């Protein structure tokens, strides 16, 4: 698949999804994951030129720009957010569809846990009845000695990796003090 044909596929999938509505009343919206800030803008601009309301979203944007995109997407004013791993975790967007433009983020393959977090952005139960995930690997594209289509199969067949959490007493105290000073914790029971 050439980059141009991938962009056309993304456009068709995003338009089709935006024309669907969940039983909970939300229109279908799409998150596209790609591997660089530059590509977020390139894909978003392509989609905008094809009459798809898309926005690039990455860590290099100002806080206010990111917040505006988040609010506009949440309100259904934007049908597509094209992002790096910046939206992989912790954001509860009303997306019904996730498209992987690339399985490389930055300069490494995404891990099974990252993949799980990213595909988990599609079909949030409070918004949609189902989630759809598309992988658009480039056949013949190798990275770090492995083809993208082989990596796609590995990720689809993988289980999440174990997570090991190490607690540092000093860091725990710092976090507790930060939570208290920001008033996110109001009672000792919440500690």
Task: Briefly describe each language-model feature range.
Residues 74-95, 99-102, 120:
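Beta-edge loop/turn motif
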Residues 27-28, 50-53, 78, 93-97, ...:
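Short glycine-/polar-rich loops that comprise or flank the Walker A/P-loop
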Residues 2-3, 36-40, 61-63, 87-89, ...:
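Conserved nucleotide-binding/hydrolysis micro-motifs of P-loop NTPases
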Residues 73, 161-191:
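C-terminal accessory/connector segments of nucleic-acid motor ATPases
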Residues 42, 53-84:
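Conserved helicase ATPase core of P-loop NTP-dependent helicases/translocases
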Residues 93, 104-153:
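Conserved segment of the helicase C-terminal RecA-like domain
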Residues 1-8, 47-57:
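Glycine-rich phosphate-binding "P-loop"
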Residues 1-36, 138-140:
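Conserved interdomain linker/interface between the two RecA-like ATPase lobes of SF2 helicase motors
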């Amino acid at each position: 698949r050439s980059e141009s044909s991938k962009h056309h596929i993304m456009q068709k999938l995003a338009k089709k999804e935006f024309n669907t509505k969940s039983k909970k009343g939300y229109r279908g919206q799409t998150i596209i994951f790609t591997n660089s800030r530059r590509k977020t803008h390139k894909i978003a601009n392509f989609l905008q030129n094809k009459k798809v309301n898309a926005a690039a979203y990455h860590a290099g944007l100002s806080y206010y720009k990111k917040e505006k995109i988040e609010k506009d997407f949440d309100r259904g004013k934007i049908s597509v957010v094209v992002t790096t791993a910046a939206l992989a975790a912790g954001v509860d967007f009303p997306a019904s569809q996730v498209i992987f433009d690339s399985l490389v983020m930055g300069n490494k393959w995404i891990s099974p846990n990252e993949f799980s977090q990213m595909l988990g952005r599609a079909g949030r139960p409070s918004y949609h009845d189902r989630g759809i995930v598309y992988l658009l690997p480039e056949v013949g594209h190798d990275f770090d000695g492995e083809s993208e289509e082989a990596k796609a199969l590995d990720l689809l067949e993988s289980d999440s990796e174990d997570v090991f959490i190490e607690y540092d007493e000093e860091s725990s105290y710092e976090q507790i003090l930060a939570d208290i000073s920001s008033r996110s914790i109001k009672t000792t029971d919440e500690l």
